[in-house]
Structure formats: structure tokens, C-alpha cells
């Protein structure tokens, strides 16, 4: 590693060799701390031994001059100011601290809270605080320095202080040990992490104070007697403490101190260079013009600069070697983040000394950190370097070595890190030509389509600088000229179309436009160029390119008019600013002014293509339609209405008809002055459609056979009327009654084609809804009963259609029926609408059963019933899945709103585990809502679901050997999920769980084998399912249930000759005393004092981490892991007593490896396998028939080598699993509804962060 020392400092080594300065001691301590036994260091990476050895050797060779400089003795020159009345030694002889003078022996400890409280409150600026402290220091150096030391101690959260006597008699390590013992905080918080408004700004004020302290001392005390060596030595010692507060605060102070010293060193370097130039200029003068006095003065000044630089570099070396080298791998991520952030500042401010591979490697290694804060600091530090083209040119070796890691971070699991990683690669793209390959860039291209807006926008900026800027930027100089350049705009459009086509995400133009909006918005809002390219006859665009260009035009119009990202894209912004709203209004007006005259031309040109017409019609949603009136554009409105009518008559596609109906709805608002003209055009269109429908319907009703053309014509007319009935009230045309007669004929005779039935069902459904909207309190009872009669008749028609042979008709009837039943449910009268009570409708039992049967046949399909999934495309499978999810959601709504009996939910709950991936979120939400409605009934429904599945399994497989079947294993998993659904509120659900157990026991013994038979009862295996709910029981309830089971077994006419297996399993589950919920509610309270907590799977995680090598060709030596918390002060005897668990016989922590006193394996219980006596002490922790074995532990840990039973270990693992699954239940599956979830499509796979630090 290159040294920070000047080569001219070598001649000072011998003269200062006998000096014993505190800085030298701290340096030696820092060098000793580099050994593997250094404490509190977390391994940075899991690298192979070869890579580690390679870096060790390289580091040794590179750092040789640095090590030599560290071994040099730093000699400070004497102070140049007049001596004080009481001279104080600059470097004390005793240990490494300043010894107060004799006159200060009886002085009290100076007030230490004034400075700390001032920094905490931030009442005044840091400069005034430092100036005030400097005045106190100049009056009494010892008291002033002691006040500064105690300020840092108080900043750590320690209430103890350092007294003058402690400085006299104790070393640094002894002082820190004393402070550690006195560190008796009430909570785990300290000033840097404490919550509350009083501590909110403490860290900023603390860092500003340290910065200002060095800044104010750089021209006086820093080189003139100030004991900075002692302060650095103290901070180095505190940074190696096991107390987190000491380590965190002192590291932050040392790093900020180092940053300030780097700035001072930079200034000294500049002054030194300036002095050298002045000296050379003076020396090059002629003998007559040369001034010897000035040469001598410049030489003295250069010598002073050289000495000052040596002192600063000595301090910097001590901090770097004593603090940074250890703490950048600290177990606390906040400490690691501070180190990485500051070294990035050093590289930017003093690049000549710090910007080299010897320092860059620390950032490169830490790119693999497990915590996002540390990775984020690494990426931001590198971004500051790569943003400077001069600095980036010196980072070629680092870029080549760590480029793959930086590229992989664009798919980081944390979106903030991924965003900064993409911005970092954008800087590399700008300032380092040819570094990123095509494969590297392709990994970023697809990110423009993901749901996270920040990531997509960053990726859009990368795409802009990679693809568009080199071509478009070369054709224009400024932004204004670029917008006016037709050639640059046309080039941009062609490049955008090429990129869009190659991406293979042709349905997501809105996402692409939103991603490029921030960096290329001026291009995308050039609607003149977009429309001119579409309307030109010789534009040489293919059909696919025209379609994409229209999608881009519509997407850019939507983005400008609405001002927010498309649906499904996550953004942290809540509202627009005033400036953004003003720009949005301006863009909306300009959009309408330009496109209103051109929209009829576009519709006329692309009217034959349904995929082009539908998006063009959506453009009306983004116009300011008042412009038709204010700017006298009525003639363009007439042309638009003509094109609308032609589109409706020409097309039958649902998306085109819906877009046309919605466009006409936007124009038919009464507040517009042209409303009468648009309403007349709408009436003409509907009259045309209704006349055609009446004629074609008469032909159908009078004839039993229609040719294909007649069926197609009638179907097309019904589709058009249905689409317009959705957006417009067509009640006055009275087309509902003819459609009802048509549907009745279809149900009675089956002679109506299914193509006609689908739109007819929808049309009648919309007519009922429009009638409901006209009802008010003044509506007569006769009108209400007429509406209900129509609704009941339509429900009967839909019920008949549920048994139709066409699946599309069945699904359409189910959806419409579910919606109507929900609308006319008892919820209809909520909110003071009692006048609607006559309309409330309750379905009959037959209808409820048919709805449940339909759900089983169309939603919960077995894998073989889904058809040939391999031959169908992925998007078809996804659409079918969404359709099934809609059907299930409709049925669940009927359950939750009281339309159907809640017991019918068992048909849904019993498929919870088997179809968890497809419908898990819907069923979980239904289960949660059902429990909120009726807790007791919901628990019975869960038990009913298990009973139904068990009964079905017996009917299929018979009662023998059920527990080994895959179906029974799935049932156990389902029972476990049901148990987890109760949540951690054990006391709240106590009665429900006990009731569930009792009902389950009754069911298991409800059917008995014939008298004299040795077979088990057919339902006895149900007890194994019931055992999954046992961890939710209290110990008292377990004992009661054991007694209840014993009584039930005693009623069996023939006692078994050997215990039944399910009974044994169930009894074992009831013998477990502690579980997760009970331990959390009944366990002893945690001590507030900080102590060491070693995770149970620490060794497993450590061993597993060794197998995950990053395959890097470099890596630092991994130090020995040590704790970072203060151990609880208790004797081994006390620990042993705590671990015994209670009085009574049992395994205990014996003095040797053999088993302690306690009962051995004895005979098991009687035939019923019921233990009726109360267990106490450690007997509750083990079954009498369980085998014992020993756990080999660390011999140095007292009280840890106790015996454990296999059952107790199983219990611990099971309860840990239950705790984790409880958390999963509580947090829910948030990604299931995401349009770009990691489990779908592969567009949002942000789960590739390589973790190389174990989480302790």
C-alpha cells in the first residue's frame, strides 16, 4: 500500500527512536490488532484459501512502505508559543496520557455535560462551541482536554466520567475496562441510535463538532502542542471495545476526524507545492535579483510544511490502521457503513494518496455485504468516483476486477441498492468507454419494464445514454435545438421502435414510456413528429411498427395528461407539486390542440385494424374537451362522431366497442355546449342497432334454424348493444324484455346458439343495474316488486345456465349471478336505505349447492383436468388462472357478505394447502375475515374441512394404513396451516383450540370396529391431524385433554392389545410443555442489561457459509469471530442453576461428560398410553420412553454441557419453525398480486444479492 509519508522523512527515524509517544503505542496496538485474534470483526467474504493467500501476499508487498512508515517514530517539534506559568509535558512519561499538573491535584472533575448538552440540543453552531472550548483549553490545557475526552464518553451513552486521577494511574485499556464495567444503561439505545426528537439531530451535530474542531485547530493547536495523539489513542481503544455504543460512537468520531485530517493534509500538500514553485522561481532568478533572505524563508516554510505533513500523516496512519482496517468488517452494519462512506470521501478529496487499488479493494470486498445500508454506501462511494472522468480513468484495474459484481447488483433484492447500482453503471458508461459489454447492458434493458418506478427510471436513463444519446445527441447541440431538430426526433423514434421490438414486451409500451419520461420527455412529447410519421404514406413502417408507434403515442399522451406512472408501477410520490400540476395542465392543452384535428384522420386511416383503433379512441380520455367549444373545433367533432359510428358498425371486438362506448360517454356530458349534438348522434346509432336487433330477433324466434351469417349478425348486434348498455342508459329503448324471451327460449329448447346467449345475458344484467340506479325513496312499492321479479327471473335463468354444456356460458352465468346476489344481499339496506328492503334476496339451498358444485368443477381443478398445458402459451395459462381467481373471489364474497351459509366455506378451506400457490392469498383473506365475523364458527369450519377430506380419503383408500399416503401427508400440512392461522394470541384463542381438540377426539372415536375385531377405529388416524394443533394449547389444557382422551378410550368395548399409533402420536404432542406462544407469554422477563446472546444455529450458519465461495481471486484474511456485547456478570454456578429448569430429578449439567443423575428409560404407560399423573420439573421435558444422548458443547462455557432428549430437540426445532411460520402468516404474501412478482415472468427477479457475511 503506498505510504502517505514523504520519502524525506527517513532521516528522522534514528533521532526519535528513543521517544515513547502515545501515537507510537497506538500504532503498535493497531499493528497487533491486525492479527486474527482481533475482536469484534465479522468476516467480510467467504473466499477460498487460495484467494486469501494471494491477497495476503499482495497486500504485504504493496503495504511495505506503509508499514515502514508506521514503524517510524513520530517526533513533534516544540511549541512555538511562550511557555505557560506551569509547564506541562507534551508527551507524558506515564502510560500514554496527560498527567495534570501539581496545582490541579485537588481540583474537582470539570463539568462534562455542558459541551455534550450543547451538542445534543444544537442550540448554537458548532464553530461557536469549538471556539468556546478552545478558550477554556488555552486557560487550562489539562482540564480542557479532559472535558473533550468526557464529551466523547458521554456521546457513547456512558454516564461515567474520566477523572484526573484515572489519567494519572490507569492506562487506556484500564480506563476503557472501567468504563465498560460502569456502562449500566437502562436500555439498548445510546445517543446515536436513541429514538425521540431530542436525539434526532445528535449525529449530525456530533459529526459537525468533530469536523469543526479539526478545522479550527489546523493553523494553531493541531501542530502546536495539542494532544491529538492521546485523543486518537483513546478512540482506537474504544473502537475495539465489546460495547456496541463505544465501538459505534468512537468509530464514527475517528472516521470523521480522519476525513477532516485528510482535508488538512490536502491543504498542506497544496501549500507545499506552492512553496516549492515559489522557491524554484526565486532560485532561478539572476544573482542580482535573487534575495537570499527570501530563499531562506521559503526553505524554513517548506521545512515547516514537511514537519506538519509528517504529523498529519502519522495521525492518519494510526486511525486507518487502528480503526478502519478492523471496523470495516465489524458485525454492526452501521459501523461498516460509516467506514465505507468515509473512505469514499477520502478518495474523492485526496485522490493522489487514497485513490489506488490498495484502498479501493476495501470497497470492492464490501460490495458483497449482507446488509443493504453497507452495499448502498459502497455504490454511492463508487458513484462519486466514477462521476469524475479524471478519477475514473485511474480505476481500470478495480473496474475489471469488480465489474461483474457491480453489474449483478442491478438485480439486488433491495430496490434502493439496485437503483444506485444502475446509476453507477450509467456513470461508467459515460466516463469509461468500452468497459460494459453488450451482455452487461442487456441485463439492464429489461429493467425498464419492472414495477418499481425508481429502478425503471434509472434503467431508462441508462438506455437513453447507451442507445439514443450517441445518435440523437450528435445531431443537436443544446436541448432546445434538439427538440426542434426533425432529424434528431425521427432518429429517436426509429431507435425507440427498434428497442421496443427487440424487447419482446410489446404489450407494455406504457412502462417503456414511463421509464424514459424523465430523461427523454421532450422527445416523447413531440406529438407532431409522432403523428406526422403515422399519417405519412411513405413512412416505410410495417404493421407491427405502426401498432407500436400508436401505443407509444397513446402512452405518452396518458403520461402527460395524468402525470403519474401507469397502473401497477410502484412510486413513492404521493402528489404532484404546483410546478408539475402547471406543466401537466399545459401539456394537456397542447395535446388536445394538436390531436383534435388529427384524430379523425388517424381513425379513418386505421379504422380497419381493431388493435390500432382501440388505443386511438382512448386518446379522448386525455383531452381537455372544452377546447372543442373555446377554439371553435365543432367541425372536427362532427368528423369524429362520423368515425365513431363507422367504427361501431364495422367492429365487434370487445375492446373496440368498449373504447367507442367510453369515448361517446365522455362527449355526452350535459355540461358541454355540444351535448345536444352528441346526444343526437348517440340516439341515431342506438336506433340503428335496436332496429336491426328487433328484425333479427323476430327471425330467430319464428325459425328453428339460422344460418351462420344470421347468427353472426345477431351476435354482433347484441355485442354492440351490450357494450353501449354498459356505459349508457338504454332503458328507453326497451330491449331487455326481448332478450329475456330469447334467454327463456334458449333454456327451454336449447335451440339458441351459445354465441347469442353470452351477450344477451350481459345485456339483461345491465338493464337491471340501470333500473336500480333510478330507484329513490319516492319509488312505489309496485315498481320495487316489479324489479325484484325481474331479478329473480334472471337469477333462475342464470341458475339454469350453470348446467349448460358450454363452459363460457357457465362461467358468465356464475359471474353475473354472484354479482346480482351480492348487490341484492342484506348489505343493500346498510347506510339508511331501508326503502330497499323489499329488494333483498336470499338464495335457496339448491342454488347455494349449485354454486359450490360449480366452484369445485371450474376452480379447484386437478393438474390432469387443466388440459395440455405444455401446448398452450404462457399468457393463455395466466389468463385462465386469473379467470379462475375471479370466480373464487366472487364465491368468497358471497360467503363473507352473508349471501351463502358460512359453513360452505369448508369447500374452499379444504383446498388451502393444495392450491396455495394459485389461490393462497384469496383463501387466507377469506379465512381471516371469517374469523372476524364469528371466531367459534370459523374454528368449526376448519375442523369440518379436515373431516370432509378425511372422509373422502377413507372412501377412496379405505381405513387401513392411511398415515403413509401422500394425500394424508397433505392433510397434515393443511392442518398445520390451519393451526398457524390462529396467530400468536394463544390466550385469546384458548377456548377455540380446546373446543377443536374435543370435537376432533369425538370424531376420531365416533365409529368403532366390530366387537371382537383387532382393527383400529376407521377415524382414529384423525388424531394425527389433530396433533398439529397441540402447540397452540396451554399446559393445563393439555392435561385436561389427556384426561378427556383417556375417558373416551375407556368407553371402547375392546381395549387394544398394543397401543394405537395415532393415539401415541397425539399423546406425545400433548406431553410437550413449552411452545413458542407459551414461552413468549409465560417466560421470565428479559434483563435490560446488555448481554451476549449466541444464536442456536450459529455454528451451522458459520459452517454453511464456508461452502459459499465467491470465486474471487482476492480476499482478506478472515479473523476470529468474537462477541460485540458485554457479558452478563454471573457466576457459572448461577448459570447452571438457571439451566436446570427447576427442582426434581432429571438430567443436569454434571461435572463430566457422562450423564448426570436422573431417571433412565423405564417402562411406558399402560395400554391407553395416558399419563394421568401431573408431571413436574424436568420430567415435563422428556417422555419416560425417550432415549437420551449427550450434546457436546464448548468446554469453556459453564452450564452448557447438559443432557438433552431427542424429543426436546425436536420440540425446539418444531417451535422455531412454528414461530417462523407465524411471522409468515402475519406478514402475508405481498407479491402474489404484483404484476411483476419474482415468481412470474422473470421480469422482477431482484433476489440475486450474494451474501458473504453471516448474520449473527
UniProtKB/Swiss-Prot annotation:
Q: Which Gene Ontology molecular-function terms are recorded? A: chromatin binding
Sites bearing Phosphoserine, chain numbering? 1234
Q: Where along the chain is composition biased (Basic residues)?
A: 72-83, 1126-1140
| Sequence segments annotated as region (Disordered) | 1-110, 1096-1169, 1230-1256
Tell me the organism: Rattus norvegicus
Q: What is this protein called?
A: Cohesin subunit SA-3
Q: What post-translational events are described?
A: Phosphorylated.
Q: For this UniProt entry, which segments traverse the membrane? A: none
**InterPro entries the UniProt entry points to:** ARM-like, ARM-type_fold, Cohesin_Scc3/SA, HEAT_SCC3-SA, SCD, STAG
Q: Does the keyword Cell cycle apply?
A: yes
Give the Polar residues compositional bias ranges. Answer: 1113-1125
- Where does this protein have compositionally biased stretches of type Pro residues? 1144-1166
Amino acid at each position: 500500500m503506498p505510504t502517505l509519508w514523504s520519502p524525506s522523512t527517513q532521516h528522522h527515524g534514528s533521532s526519535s527512536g528513543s521517544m515513547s509517544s502515545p501515537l507510537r503505542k497506538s500504532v503498535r496496538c493497531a499493528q497487533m490488532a491486525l492479527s486474527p485474534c482481533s475482536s469484534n470483526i465479522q468476516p467480510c467474504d467467504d473466499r477460498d484459501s487460495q484467494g486469501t493467500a494471494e491477497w495476503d501476499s499482495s497486500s504485504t508487498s504493496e503495504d511495505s512502505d506503509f508499514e515502514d512508515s508506521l514503524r517510524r517514530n513520530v517526533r513533534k517539534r516544540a511549541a512555538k508559543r511562550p511557555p505557560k506559568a506551569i509547564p506541562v509535558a507534551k508527551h507524558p512519561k506515564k502510560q500514554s496520557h496527560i498527567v495534570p499538573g501539581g496545582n490541579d491535584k485537588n481540583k474537582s472533575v470539570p463539568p462534562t455535560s455542558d459541551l455534550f448538552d450543547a451538542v445534543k440540543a444544537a442550540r448554537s453552531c458548532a464553530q461557536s462551541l469549538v471556539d468556546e472550548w478552545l478558550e477554556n483549553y488555552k486557560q487550562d490545557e489539562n482540564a480542557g482536554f479532559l472535558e473533550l475526552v468526557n464529551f466523547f464518553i458521554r456521546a457513547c451513552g456512558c454516564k461515567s466520567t474520566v477523572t484526573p486521577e484515572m489519567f494519572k494511574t490507569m492506562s487506556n485499556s484500564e480506563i476503557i475496562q472501567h468504563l465498560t464495567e460502569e456502562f449500566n444503561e437502562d436500555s439498548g439505545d445510546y445517543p446515536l441510535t436513541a429514538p425521540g426528537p431530542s436525539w434526532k439531530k445528535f449525529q449530525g451535530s456530533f459529526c459537525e463538532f468533530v469536523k469543526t474542531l479539526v478545522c479550527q485547530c489546523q493553523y494553531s493547536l493541531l501542530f502546536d502542542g495539542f494532544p491529538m495523539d492521546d485523543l486518537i489513542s483513546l478512540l482506537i481503544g474504544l473502537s475495539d471495545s465489546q460495547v456496541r455504543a463505544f465501538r459505534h460512537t468512537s468509530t464514527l468520531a475517528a472516521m470523521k476526524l480522519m476525513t477532516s485530517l485528510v482535508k488538512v493534509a490536502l491543504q498542506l500538500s497544496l501549500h507545499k507545492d506552492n512553496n516549492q514553485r515559489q522557491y524554484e522561481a526565486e532560485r532561478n532568478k539572476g544573482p542580482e535579483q535573487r534575495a537570499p533572505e527570501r530563499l531562506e524563508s521559503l526553505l524554513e516554510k517548506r521545512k515547516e510544511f514537511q514537519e506538519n505533513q509528517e504529523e498529519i500523516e502519522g495521525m492518519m496512519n494510526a486511525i486507518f490502521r487502528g480503526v478502519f482496517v478492523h471496523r470495516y468488517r465489524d458485525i454492526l452494519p452501521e459501523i461498516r457503513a460509516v467506514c465505507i462512506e468515509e473512505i469514499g470521501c477520502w478518495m474523492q478529496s485526496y485522490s493522489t494518496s487514497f485513490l489506488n487499488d490498495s484502498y479501493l479493494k476495501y470497497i470492492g470486498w464490501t460490495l458483497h455485504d449482507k446488509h443493504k445500508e453497507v452495499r448502498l454506501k459502497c455504490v454511492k462511494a463508487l458513484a462519486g468516483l466514477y462521476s469524475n472522468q479524471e478519477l475514473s480513468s485511474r480505476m481500470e484495474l478495480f473496474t475489471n476486477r469488480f465489474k461483474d459484481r457491480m453489474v449483478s447488483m442491478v438485480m439486488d433484492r433491495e430496490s434502493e441498492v439496485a437503483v444506485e447500482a444502475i446509476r453507477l453503471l450509467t456513470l461508467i458508461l459515460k466516463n469509461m468507454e468500452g468497459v460494459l459489454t453488450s451482455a452487461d447492458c442487456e441485463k439492464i434493458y429489461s429493467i425498464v419494464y419492472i414495477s418499481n418506478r425508481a429502478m425503471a427510471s434509472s434503467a431508462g436513463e441508462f438506455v437513453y445514454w447507451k442507445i439514443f444519446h450517441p445518435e440523437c445527441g450528435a445531431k443537436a447541440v443544446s436541448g432546445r435545438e434538439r427538440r426542434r431538430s426533425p432529424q434528431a426526433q425521427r432518429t429517436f423514434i426509429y431507435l425507440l421502435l427498434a428497442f421496443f421490438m427487440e424487447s419482446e414486451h410489446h404489450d407494455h409500451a406504457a412502462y417503456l414510456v414511463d421509464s424514459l419520461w424523465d430523461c427523454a420527455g421532450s422527445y416523447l412529447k413531440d406529438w407532431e413528429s409522432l403523428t406526422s410519421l403515422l399519417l405519412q404514406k411513405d413512412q416505410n413502417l410495417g404493421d407491427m411498427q405502426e401498432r407500436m408507434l400508436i401505443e407509444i403515442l397513446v402512452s405518452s399522451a396518458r403520461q402527460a395528461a395524468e402525470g403519474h406512472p401507469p397502473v401497477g408501477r410502484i412510486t413513492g410520490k404521493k402528489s404532484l407539486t404546483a410546478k408539475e400540476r402547471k406543466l401537466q395542465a399545459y401539456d394537456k392543452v397542447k395535446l388536445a390542440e394538436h390531436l383534435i384535428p388529427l384524430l379523425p384522420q388517424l381513425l379513418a386511416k386505421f379504422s380497419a385494424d381493431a388493435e390500432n383503433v382501440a388505443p386511438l379512441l382512448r386518446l379522448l380520455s386525455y383531452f381537455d374537451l372544452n377546447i372543442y367549444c373555446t377554439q371553435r373545433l365543432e367541425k372536427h367533432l362532427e368528423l369524429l362522431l362520423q368515425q365513431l359510428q363507422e367504427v361501431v358498425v364495422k367492429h365487434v371486438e370487445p375492446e373496440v366497442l368498449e373504447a367507442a362506448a367510453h369515448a361517446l360517454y365522455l362527449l355526452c356530458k350535459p355540461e358541454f355546449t355540444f351535448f345536444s349534438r352528441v346526444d343526437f348522434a348517440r340516439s341515431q346509432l342506438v336506433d340503428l342497432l335496436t332496429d336491426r336487433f328487433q328484425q333479427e330477433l323476430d327471425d330467430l324466434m319464428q325459425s328453428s334454424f339460422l344460418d351462420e351469417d344470421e347468427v353472426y349478425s345477431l351476435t354482433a348486434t347484441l355485442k354492440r348493444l351490450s357494450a353501449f348498455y354498459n356505459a349508457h342508459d338504454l332503458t328507453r329503448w326497451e330491449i331487455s324484455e326481448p332478450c329475456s324471451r330469447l334467454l327463456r327460449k334458449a333454456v327451454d329448447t336449447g335451440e339458441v346458439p351459445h354465441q347469442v346467449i353470452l351477450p344477451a345475458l350481459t345485456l339483461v344484467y345491465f338493464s337491471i343495474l340501470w333500473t336500480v340506479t333510478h330507484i329513490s325513496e319516492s319509488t312505489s312499492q309496485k315498481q320495487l316488486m316489479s324489479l325484484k321479479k325481474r331479478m329473480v327471473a334472471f337469477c333462475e335463468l342464470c341458475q339454469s345456465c350453470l348446467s349448460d354444456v358450454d363452459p363460457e356460458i357457465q362461467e358468465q352465468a356464475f359471474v353475473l349471478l354472484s354479482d346480482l346476489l351480492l348487490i341484492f344481499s342484506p348489505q343493500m339496506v346498510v347506510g339508511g336505505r331501508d326503502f330497499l328492503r323489499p329488494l333483498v334476496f336470499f338464495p335457496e339451498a339448491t342454488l347455494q349447492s349449485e354454486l359450490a358444485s360449480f366452484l369445485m368443477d371450474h376452480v379447484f381443478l386437478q393438474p390432469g383436468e387443466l388440459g395440455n398445458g405444455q401446448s398452450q402459451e404462457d399468457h393463455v395459462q395466466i389468463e385462465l388462472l386469473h379467470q379462475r381467481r375471479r370466480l373464487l373471489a366472487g364465491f368468497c364474497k358471497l360467503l363473507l357478505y352473508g349471501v351463502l351459509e358460512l359453513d360452505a366455506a369448508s369447500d374452499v378451506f379444504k383446498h388451502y394447502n393444495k392450491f396455495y400457490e394459485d389461490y393462497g392469498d384469496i383463501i387466507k383473506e377469506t379465512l381471516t375475515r371469517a374469523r372476524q365475523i364469528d371466531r367459534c364458527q370459523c374454528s368449526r369450519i376448519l375442523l369440518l374441512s379436515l373431516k370432509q377430506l378425511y372422509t373422502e380419503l377413507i372412501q377412496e383408500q379405505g381405513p387401513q394404513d392411511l398415515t403413509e399416503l401422500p394425500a394424508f401427508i397433505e392433510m397434515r400440512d393443511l392442518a398445520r396451516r390451519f393451526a398457524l392461522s390462529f396467530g400468536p394470541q394463544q390466550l385469546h384463542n384458548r377456548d377455540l383450540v380446546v373446543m377443536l381438540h374435543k370435537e376432533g377426539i369425538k370424531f376420531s372415536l365416533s365409529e368403532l370396529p366390530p366387537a371382537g375385531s383387532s382393527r383400529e377405529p376407521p377415524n382414529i388416524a384423525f388424531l394425527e391431524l389433530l396433533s398439529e394443533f397441540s402447540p397452540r394449547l396451554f399446559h393445563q389444557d393439555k392435561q385436561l385433554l389427556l384426561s378427556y382422551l383417556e375417558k373416551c378410550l375407556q368407553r371402547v368395548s375392546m381395549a387394544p392389545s398394543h397401543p394405537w399409533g395415532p393415539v401415541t402420536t397425539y399423546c406425545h404432542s400433548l406431553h410437550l410443555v413449552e411452545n413458542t406462544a407459551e414461552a413468549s407469554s409465560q417466560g421470565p422477563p428479559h434483563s435490560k442489561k446488555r448481554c451476549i446472546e449466541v444464536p442456536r444455529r450459529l455454528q451451522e450458519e458459520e459452517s454453511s457459509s464456508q461452502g459459499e465461495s465467491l470465486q474471487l481471486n482476492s480476499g482478506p484474511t478472515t479473523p476470529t469471530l468474537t462477541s460485540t456485547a458485554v457479558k452478563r456478570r454471573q457466576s457459572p454456578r448461577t448459570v447452571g442453576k438457571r439451566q436446570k429448569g427447576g427442582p426434581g430429578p432429571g438430567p443436569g449439567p454434571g461435572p463430566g461428560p457422562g450423564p448426570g443423575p436422573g431417571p433412565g428409560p423405564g417402562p411406558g404407560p399402560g395400554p391407553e398410553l395416558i399419563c394421568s399423573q401431573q408431571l413436574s420439573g424436568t420430567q415435563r421435558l422428556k417422555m419416560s420412553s425417550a432415549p437420551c444422548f449427550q450434546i457436546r458443547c464448548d468446554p469453556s462455557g459453564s452450564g452448557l454441557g447438559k443432557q438433552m432428549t431427542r424429543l426436546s430437540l425436536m420440540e425446539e426445532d418444531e417451535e422455531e419453525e412454528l414461530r417462523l411460520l407465524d411471522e409468515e402468516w402475519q406478514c402475508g404474501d405481498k407479491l402474489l398480486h404484483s404484476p411483476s412478482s419474482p415468481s412470474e415472468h422473470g421480469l422482477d427477479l431482484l433476489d440475486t444479492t450474494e451474501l458473504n457475511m453471516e448474520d449473527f
